[in-house]
Amino acid sequence: MPPKAADKKPASKAPATASKAPEKKDAGKKTAASGDKKKRTKTRKETYSSYIYKVLKQVHPDTGISNRAMSILNSFVNDIFERVATEASKLAAYNKKSTISSREIQTSVRLILPGELAKHAVSEGTKAVTKYSSSTK
């Protein structure tokens, strides 16, 4: 005897057991298909190396750079980035704002970098923002 209409469940695309949220796996580890051996995947290290190299080639096309020098420059860029971001965050908090705008970045650059260097940095930053704004319209 066929089941009554009230006893039937509506058809679903996925089985009931698959409705659970998928389990999170470790990002740095992958298990091999055979045996208990575990294969680790390399974690990506994000650096400014490619950008530093491009700028170097624009300024001095025939000059190279060692890995050690590239590492030092990368650390330098990370340090300056962190200082500017921290200062901009403080400025936004002082003004009771939850968003860091170009104004906070500009002010933090003026506070962190000395004299002429700050003027050039602000000038180049303004130029970059203007170029970006005109290209997105």
From Swiss-Prot:
Q: Which GO terms describe its molecular function?
A: DNA binding; protein heterodimerization activity; structural constituent of chromatin
Q: Where is this cross-link: Glycyl lysine isopeptide (Lys-Gly) (interchain with G-Cter in ubiquitin)?
A: 131
**Where are the residues linked by the Glycyl lysine isopeptide (Lys-Gly) (interchain with G-Cter in SUMO) cross-link?**
8-9, 24-25
A GO CC term assigned to this protein in UniProt: nucleosome
Q: Where is this region: Disordered?
A: 1-45
Q: Quote the InterPro entries the UniProt record gives.
A: Histone-fold, Histone_H2A/H2B/H3, Histone_H2B, HISTONE_H2B_site
Listed under subunit, the entry gives:
The nucleosome is a histone octamer containing two molecules each of H2A, H2B, H3 and H4 assembled in one H3-H4 heterotetramer and two H2A-H2B heterodimers. The octamer wraps approximately 147 bp of DNA.
* Name of the protein described by the UniProt record: Histone H2B
